[in-house]
Structure formats: structure tokens, C-alpha cells
């Protein structure tokens, strides 16, 4: 394959479909040296998500197995036909595989669904004021819909409900996200509640990608959205695109990495070293990031990226990213899509906090 290299040159590389796990590489220092703690002066109660290990937010779902209900609804004013799982069966598969791989088996997803559309008791227009991005009363619509499916699903064993509507339904333009106490026939339960909207189908998003990004926020307590550029590099930006891996810093914040996944040093002990990195998008054992601790709050992170299972990039896409994490600063998403950056790492959009 012909690839770009340094000095505007091109070179052919021999590719192989057979990839072996990398041999162990000894890290000069333990993982804890590079895993600097959160040093923000304050954390807003309205934005409690973690930027560093350990995650201390009391809303985190800590158990190993997460039970998720994929509940397909249609409406009298918009009936659906066929088996609804034909729309999202591959999303369920990818959802399970992604979480298993990137959590190193520390988390397991269990999904229950229905192979027929469940008719909502009201036409879709009756829920329009409640469902959609940022609408404060989505809980009302969710409780109404869950009542319509209570004979099919046992909510008492669920952690998350994902309401899936027909792809061509235009009543709900945007998606719904909420974690709250929901009144059900099994009592008042704390559930993550999510619902599709027209935009989610036409961005285009893969349903599993959007849902997983939101669960990383609301269920597992991760801030994400840093670094914000390139926007299509991974799941942390929430932007649908070819990159579907999770950056190693976020993986480490979640407690999902194993010690052998990270090569760590600091400025005092740094010397010439050759470290072979596994691409974040590839399911391959080996060092996933090289980190250098700079100060008590700052760590340099270097990662490799390639076209692979979790990176649907164009042929020949490969490279290395480097970013600095500084845990003194909260993630500032203002200007995230405007490309603004003060170049100092304080007004954040292109640099990591």
C-alpha cells in the first residue's frame, strides 16, 4: 500500500491480514506515575463527570454487567412493519463487542429486545413536547411508553432503556438522553433512558456508537470531549465518523486499562527508548499508549491510530497523535465546533485538559 511519509514523500508498505499480539514491553515507571489525579479547584454539581482516575461521582453504575433494554415502538399515526431488530441487530453486536474489548472484559453488556414493534397507547404527536434533546420533561413521555411495554419487559432488572422509533418518523427531530428515577410497575427505579430522533439516523450515526458515548457520560461517569480535534478520531468526541476507539486516557480514567497497556516514564527518568504501540482501533494485545509525566498535574500521551476494526478510515490512514492532559482545568467545550484555541491549553478546544 502506498502511504505518505515525512518530507512529502511516499513509500510502499507491505500489509498483512495476520496480526500477532506484541511481546510485553517493560514500563520504566508504574502506571500510577502517569495517571495524575483530578486537581480542579472545584467540580460543578451539574457537571460531575470525571476527567481523571478515580471516578468519584456517586451516580456511577459500578456493577460488572449492564442490562440494557432495546424497546422498539411504533405509533397509530406512524405504524411500522417488519421485524424491528433488522434495523439494529448489528448495533447490539457491536455494542457488546466494543464494551468487552475496551473494558478489557471488566464490563459486560446484556441486551433484551423484542422482535415486534410495540404500539404506543398514544399517537406520536402526543409525546412531541416531551421527547427531544434538552427537553426537561422527557421523563413524562418515558413513563407513558414504559407502561405500554411493561407486560413484555421486566424493568426491575434493567439499568438502561433505549426507546427505538421508526427511522422515517419525523415527529421527534432530536434524540433524548436522561438518567433519572422513573415510575414503573416495579416501583420507582433509577434508569438511564434514551430515545432515537430523526437526526440520529441521518447524521448518520450508528445507534450503538451514539448510545455508548452517552453511557460513558451518564452511566460510567466520564467527561469525554477532550481532545476535541480531530472530531472523527474516536468515540470521546461524540461525533459520528470513522474513528470508534476510545483514547487511552479516558480508558484509564474508567479503570479499564491493565498495567501492561501503558508505558510510563517521567522527565527525571526519561532516556532514549523505543516503544511499539498497538493502534487504538485494533483488537491486539500490547502497549496502547506511551505516557510521560511532566508535572504533578500534566501528562503527555502518545497513541497510534490505524484503519482497523474500530477505525473505518480510508485505506492508508495511519499516524500518531500526541496530547497533554492537565487536570487543573475543567473541560471547556465552548467553541468546540468553531475550531477556537488560544494555543495555551487553557481555553480548550484543540488541546486536552
Model-derived segments and spans:
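Broad, structure-driven detector of short, well-ordered beta-strand segments within folded domains
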Residues: 1, 162, 300-304
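Propeptide-to-catalytic entry region of secreted or membrane-anchored zinc metalloproteases
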Residues: 2-11, 16-211, 219, 223-229, ...
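Extracellular hydrolytic enzyme modules, especially secreted metalloproteases
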Residues: 155, 168-313
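Extracellular low-complexity, Gly/Ser/Thr-rich intrinsically disordered linkers
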Residues: 282-353
Amino acid at each position: 500500500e502506498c502511504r505518505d511519509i515525512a518530507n512529502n514523500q511516499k513509500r510502499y508498505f507491505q500489509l498483512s491480514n495476520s496480526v500477532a499480539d506484541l511481546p510485553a514491553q517493560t514500563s520504566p515507571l508504574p502506571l500510577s506515575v502517569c495517571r495524575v489525579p483530578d486537581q480542579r479547584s472545584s467540580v460543578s454539581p451539574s457537571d460531575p463527570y470525571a476527567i481523571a482516575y478515580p471516578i468519584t461521582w456517586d451516580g456511577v453504575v459500578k456493577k460488572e454487567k449492564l442490562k440494557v433494554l432495546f424497546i422498539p415502538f411504533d405509533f397509530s399515526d406512524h405504524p411500522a412493519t417488519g421485524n424491528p431488530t433488522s434495523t439494529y441487530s448489528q448495533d447490539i453486536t457491536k455494542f457488546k463487542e466494543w464494551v468487552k474489548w475496551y473494558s478489557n472484559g471488566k464490563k459486560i453488556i446484556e441486551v433484551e429486545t423484542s422482535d415486534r414493534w410495540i404500539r404506543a397507547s398514544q399517537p406520536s404527536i402526543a409525546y412531541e413536547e416531551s421527547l427531544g434533546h434538552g427537553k426537561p420533561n422527557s421523563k413524562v413521555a418515558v413513563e407513558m411508553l414504559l407502561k405500554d411495554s411493561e407486560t413484555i419487559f421486566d424493568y426491575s432488572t434493567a439499568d438502561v432503556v433505549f426507546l427505538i422509533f421508526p427511522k422515517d418518523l419525523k415527529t421527534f427531530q432530536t434524540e433524548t438522553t436522561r438518567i433519572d428515577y422513573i415510575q414503573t410497575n416495579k416501583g420507582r427505579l433509577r434508569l438511564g433512558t434514551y430515545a432515537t430522533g430523526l437526526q440520529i439516523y441521518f447524521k448518520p450515526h450508528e445507534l450503538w456508537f451514539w448510545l455508548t458515548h452517552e453511557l460513558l457520560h451518564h452511566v460510567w461517569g466520564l467527561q469525554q470531549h477532550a481532545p476535541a480535534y480531530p472530531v472523527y478520531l474516536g468515540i470521546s468526541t461524540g461525533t459520528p465518523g470513522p474513528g470508534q476507539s476510545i483514547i487511552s486516557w479516558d480508558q484509564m480514567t474508567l479503570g479499564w486499562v491493565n498495567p501492561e497497556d501503558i508505558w510510563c516514564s517521567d522527565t527525571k527518568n526519561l532516556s532514549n527508548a523505543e516503544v511499539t504501540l498497538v493502534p487504538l482501533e485494533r483488537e491486539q494485545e500490547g502497549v496502547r499508549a506511551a505516557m510521560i509525566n511532566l508535572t504533578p498535574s500534566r501528562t503527555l500521551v502518545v497513541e497510534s491510530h490505524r484503519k482497523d476494526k474500530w477505525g473505518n478510515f480510508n485505506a492508508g490512514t495511519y499516524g500518531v497523535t500526541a496530547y497533554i492532559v492537565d487536570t487543573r482545568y475543567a473541560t471547556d467545550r465552548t467553541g468546540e465546533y468553531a475550531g477556537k484555541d488560544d494555543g495555551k491549553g487553557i481555553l480548550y478546544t484543540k488541546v486536552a485538559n
